[in-house]
Amino acid sequence: MKVILRKDVKNLGMVGDIVEVKPGYGRNYLIPQGLAEVATEGAVKNWQLGAERRAKKIEAELKAAQAAASKLKDIVLTFTKSVNTEGVVFGSVNKADIYKALKELGHEIEKENIELNMPVKKLGETDVNIYFKPTVSAVIKVKIEPVVVEAK
């Protein structure tokens, strides 16, 4: 099944791309979510008519994404967590924690753009990817430090 992508879809393509997908993926996910439409002759012609306008919009979005990515490139988010005597962290740092910390610093991102397969559960620094567009991403560092408890 051929579809025209209305929005960027990770691992599939960018806005305006005509891609071949399995029929179930197209009918059950891409089209209902508004991410794509069936690539009929009429739809392709309509899409091509608005291509110049969309190209300018895409270029502006790409520049904004690159600017946002450049602002994030040197960021280190530091979290303090309790640890036991062996240095094992109680709890973890997940997408929601990273999202909240970036929001507090004034960065506008979507939680879905944070690529974190598993919560961070170890002391030290971990690299986390933030994707703005399929071709634009930034790497931030997430650092977990132990809570300092003063002896009595």
Curated annotation (Swiss-Prot):
In Swiss-Prot or TrEMBL terms, this protein is called Large ribosomal subunit protein bL9
Q: Which GO terms describe its molecular function?
A: rRNA binding; structural constituent of ribosome
Q: Which GO terms describe its biological process?
A: translation
The record's comment on protein family reads: Belongs to the bacterial ribosomal protein bL9 family.
| Family annotation (Pfam families) | Ribosomal_L9_C, Ribosomal_L9_N
Keywords of the record, alphabetical order, are: Ribonucleoprotein, Ribosomal protein, RNA-binding, rRNA-binding
Q: Ribonucleoprotein as a keyword? A: yes
A GO cellular-component term linked to this record: ribosome
State the Gene3D superfamilies in the record: Ribosomal protein L9, C-terminal domain, Ribosomal protein L9, N-terminal domain
The record describes the protein's role as: Binds to the 23S rRNA.
